[in-house]
Amino acid sequence: MAAVLAIAISLVGLGAAGWWWLQSQSPLKLQHQSLTTPATTRFLPADANLTLVLEADPGRLPDYGRAVAPMRQRRQAAEQLEHLRDALFAAAGLDYATELADWLGDESALALSSGDTPGWVLALSSRDDDGGRQFLQRFWQSRSLAGGDLDITRYRGLGVISSRGQQSQGRPSTTSPQAEHPPLASALINDQLVLLASSRGQLEDALDASQEEARNLAGDPLLEQWLGSNRQGIALLRGDRQGIEQLLGLPASWSADQPIEQFVGSLQLDGAGVRLAAQLQNSSGESIAPLSRRDQQLLGNLNQPVQLLSLSRPNGPLATLFNLTAASDDILLPALLEGEQPLLEAQLQDSKAWLIGSSDSAPPAANLNEALAKQGFDANNLDGLQVWSHLTGQSDRQGQLQATVAGATGVAQSNRWWSNSLDGLRAQLQGHGSGGVPSELLERLNAPSGAIALLGADGRSTAELLKPWPLWRGLQLLAGQRLGPSLQGAALALSQDQSSAELDALLTFR
């Protein structure tokens, strides 16, 4: 009996150990990975305009894509992530499969500088003592055989190899990593870290910065504070206003009088999607009051599917992102967006019609009626709705005069709703549905209770929002395909105090 019990205990122990090993090796662990202070940050200059640190083995990303994709799409998802990963390294002149795959560790960092002396520094950790050294030997040997002139010197006690760069067909040298043989420089740190830079000067700046805590990201107070709040993710982001505007191609203004000076953030995998959490440092200014519970209840009272929705103050931060764009002949929507009260703004699904909701059920102000009357639209009651319309002077087939409708408004559940579509307004007032994908993603985002603005979008609207963004276009070029059809949707939340703001975003794929 004792022998049987011992065998049973051994089997249970082996099973538990096997289960633990499988869980520890699962690519799904990347979803809940805790971020730590990367060793590479010591060699990343604090004055770089944009820095990205990946705290994961790039070789595991295709496995993750395979694990979270639907059964029929697993191979395709893995191949797409593999292609995108390889293309990103190729943009820096590196072949992942032949030069990096067999030694690259869990940290890869890129620091970018723009302005008068643009350049970059790439820091790559090695999973063993020989990988980085062997990589550099092969790396420079291949470039030497291709005709590159190499300089081998020492700087701060380290061996530094650099090349002046060569271009075919007589083109001038450039610091772009996409040049055929761009000028490069490298150094090996304690056999554990490879530094590559776009020039010898950039590399020396990184080595100089490593000797002074105030000059490298390891001593950055904003990054230290961010990591001190137990963040999860696979990547860290750090940048300044110039990095936002020139490298990310995004507006760096929180509002007209509050530029964004710095930011720090992290990227976290979430199923077939990615989360961004970021803190934006801006100049001191007046704080925006959070959305009230009653305002946020508008989201739950949305009774029909929409393709885009937001809940914010029309004159609040990043207003162009949250406010609907009015058509040239729309006179009601611009008038509604002149107010200061929070509004739910929605684009109805598969329609050009919009829907506006307010937790204030008061009747329309007299000045709104006057403004519409000046445009020839009179207010009339129709089946319990207030409708602004004017006769066109034309008749339909039944001989009745036709009318053009500017919009209408009505009340349900103590909320006032507006729309430029009578059918859309009636569906909202009488329906019992939900907002569809945008509402579902906002719920999944789980925005903070102190949010000042919320945004949700389906796949098509997300693609339209991302379309003008240069970085999104660049990712599609690297991926070799349009990414818009793969989008399920996005959600975003903003919160704020006097000198900083929090941004939480979720981007999901089908």
Give the label of every model feature segment.
Residues 75-80, 146-150, 219-222, 260-263, ...:
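Glycine-rich loops and low-complexity Gly/Arg-rich segments
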Residues 52, 96-223, 339-444:
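Single conserved position on a long alpha-helix in the C-terminal lobe of the eukaryotic protein kinase
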Residues 76-79, 363, 460:
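Alpha-helix boundary/N-cap detector
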Residues 3-6, 12-157, 239, 245-256, ...:
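Structural boundary/hinge residues at secondary-structure and domain interfaces
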Residues 314, 326-327, 334-370, 489-509:
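A eukaryote-biased signal for long
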Residues 23-25, 107, 124, 144, ...:
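Short, isolated positions within intrinsically disordered regulatory regions of eukaryotic proteins
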Residues 2-21, 31-40, 171-172, 189-190, ...:
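Leucine-rich, highly hydrophobic segment in Treponema pallidum outer-membrane-associated proteins
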